[in-house]
Regions:
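Ferredoxin-type iron-sulfur electron-transfer modules and their immediate structural context
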Residues: 1-166
Length: 166
């Protein structure tokens, strides 16, 4: 990123981990406009914690989502669901992700810099970077249509479309 910044192919506003004052200082130093960027935050496409989703197996290996995913996708009943071992929390340098009591990561949008580390580390590709002003997103990555997912997770998306109508 630094090379692209110095070469002029990106503006300082694209630096997600720096403060606004820091981005302005970089712009002043380089003699360029800071530019503008809509703040993004990490969003998780799973709400299936241990209180609403079943496990199909008791995984007892290394406490890591990466490791659990290698062992037949982990123990979660929902194939697409969060494995809940906290790799995302461990990789977040900004202390923006905490595991809730039901083993689901919760993102503190005030602390999230949209650095993308959680996106990279999640073996289920459940994190994405979304504009902070987008308040509606589907917190489920189930790709099947219909009610079958509800046998695995009480809050699984059935693709009914009701959320799009509201």
């Amino acid at each position: 990123f630094a090379e692209a910044l110095v070469s002029g192919s990106v503006l300082p506003a694209k630096c997600t981990v720096s403060s606004e004052e820091g981005r302005q200082s970089i712009a002043d130093y380089l003699g360029v406009s800071m530019g503008s960027e809509i703040k993004k935050v990490a969003r998780l496409a799973c709400a299936g914690g241990t209180n609403v989703a079943i496990n199909r197996a008791n995984y007892e290996g290394l406490s890591s989502c990466q490791a659990a995913a290698i062992v037949s996708g982990g123990g979660k009943g929902c194939f697409w669901g969060c494995l809940g071992h906290g790799d995302c929390e461990a990789v977040c340098d900004f202390d923006a992700i905490k595991m809730d009591p039901f083993s689901i990561p919760v993102v503190d949008i005030a602390k999230c810099t949209a650095c993308g580390d959680c996106v990279e580390v999640c073996p289920k590709d459940l994190f994405s970077l979304q504009p902070v002003n987008h308040q509606l997103w589907v917190a489920c990555k189930n790709l099947e249509m219909g009610d079958d997912i509800l046998e695995e997770c009480q809050v699984g998306c059935t693709a009914c479309g009701k959320c799009a109508m509201d």
